[in-house]
Amino acid sequence: MSKDPGRILIFDTTLRDGEQSPGASLNLEEKLAIAHQLARLGVDVIEAGFPFASPGDFKAVNKISNDVGKENGPIICGLARASKGDIKACYEAVSPAPKKRIHTFIATSDIHLKHKLKKSRKDVLQIVPEMVNYAKTLVEDIEFSCEDASRSDPDFLYEVIQLAISAGATTINIPDTVGFTTPSEFGKLISDINKNVPNIDEAVISVHGHNDLGLAVANFLEAVKNGARQLECTINGIGERAGNASLEELVMALHVRKSFFNSFFKRNPDSPTPLTAIRTEEITKTSRLVSNLTGMTVQPNKAIVGANAFAHESGIHQDGVLKNRLTYEIIDAKTVGLSDNKISLGKLSGRSAVRARLEEMGYDLSREDLNDAFARFKDLADRKREITDRDLEAIVSEQVQLPEAKFQLCLVQVSCGNASKPTATITLLNTADNTEDTAVSVGTGPVDAVCEALNKLAKVPNELIEFSVKSVTEGIDALGEVTIRIRRDNKIYSGHSADTDVVVAAANAYVNALNRLVFSEKKNSIHPQFDNLENSNKTFLSNPAN
């Protein structure tokens, strides 16, 4: 019986593979905010995390399963290595979701078997059916991945896939784990799997790929032509190393070139039926949310969601667009949720008006979060005459982004000029013992002085590796968004903040980054690809939900 869904399923792994980007560590509230937005976006599957990694990861997957998992919503999925410890933890984490999936995997390439797993092909042929079968006793929906499939021996790969399907796998994922393959090679690999695995019709073929050679999206589209029906991707293409295949690029390629791809689904070229279930008008908002919460700025020239994606500098191009946008634009900006509309909110606007506008924009805030957001709105309205949707997005994103706060900024005072040394006075609250302390520092500029003072107070050794600031909207009174990235022990942590005063924004962003660093070191998680299987057969936690 064919498992072909008749369209493309979008499997979002922003919260799992995307979070493995250096500096992109997210707290529980941030993960929930992104998961809710992914559900509004219309993804079919949310890979919420790797539950066995740490108690924090388990709790996040469990909370998303409980709060975002709905009968009419996305499947909530957790990752598990091919071992009982991982699979059991994964099942317990996703169990509250009405639609749940266990995604288990093992490497199939000889280089991974020899150097990472220290196992033989014979070992893998024994492990795969045993672990898939075990997972099947817990949930019906099982995805199995052949890690590093693109560098695996094809005949061995076919054998592993056949065993996984026979044991109960309903989705077979073919990863290009190191971004090694080219479109023609990847398309042929999917085609050959269809031809050489006798029971392949009993499972959906999925693909997962990294962008090390800049070919991930092209590889996926070639895979679609050859029978892949699930695409594993991330918002803004974030992920380890050069990132993953970009969700927005894949979705819009299938949207804009639907007449081309329809034939691969046995449809009439002019069929109006969408190839995905994505609500494209939610793309821009989702991109900005992920960018703000992870601290990973989207490059200006990035397709679909970059600041310049719909900008025209050339006079010839500008003239053509003014006469007819189709002359130089293949996508209407409104299709991905871009709008120049401004809202008439100001300092006289009340809580109800702000709440109503946020609800129209798709934000569902708790009473406490709404009160905090409204307080920030009123503070901004006293300094800025006209409040735009982008201003509200910045306010809400920062509100959600606040990590577990060991440190809270109480005072920022800076003096600088061309005839004086930049000097910063900072007061910081340490919530661990509820004490305030003040420090004064000089620096090469006001931001450097602020960071030096904060380092004196926090006493958390780190290296500042990136500082960036951009304007949220136009005008002299615009909010300035600051992103700061710091490094400690080869790990990167990001902080983000927005304020009409960029020095205050920089101070808040630096404190956020410090709080992330402290929170991450408490978390003590493991990586699914770099820890051996033996570790996962140990007892996970006596009470993993705590």
Curated annotation (Swiss-Prot):
UniProt cross-references to Gene3D superfamilies, sorted A to Z: 1.10.238.260, 3.30.160.270, Aldolase class I (3.20.20.70)
Domain of life: Bacteria
Cofactor(s) named in the record: Mn(2+)
Organism: Prochlorococcus marinus (strain MIT 9312)
Keywords: Amino-acid biosynthesis, Branched-chain amino acid biosynthesis, Cytoplasm, Leucine biosynthesis, Manganese, Metal-binding, Transferase
The enzyme's E.C. designation: 2.3.3.13
Descriptive protein name: 2-isopropylmalate synthase
Keyword flag Amino-acid biosynthesis: yes
GO cellular component assignments: cytoplasm
Molecular-function annotations in GO: 2-isopropylmalate synthase activity; acetyl-CoA C-acetyltransferase activity; manganese ion binding
Homology family: Belongs to the alpha-IPM synthase/homocitrate synthase family. LeuA type 1 subfamily.
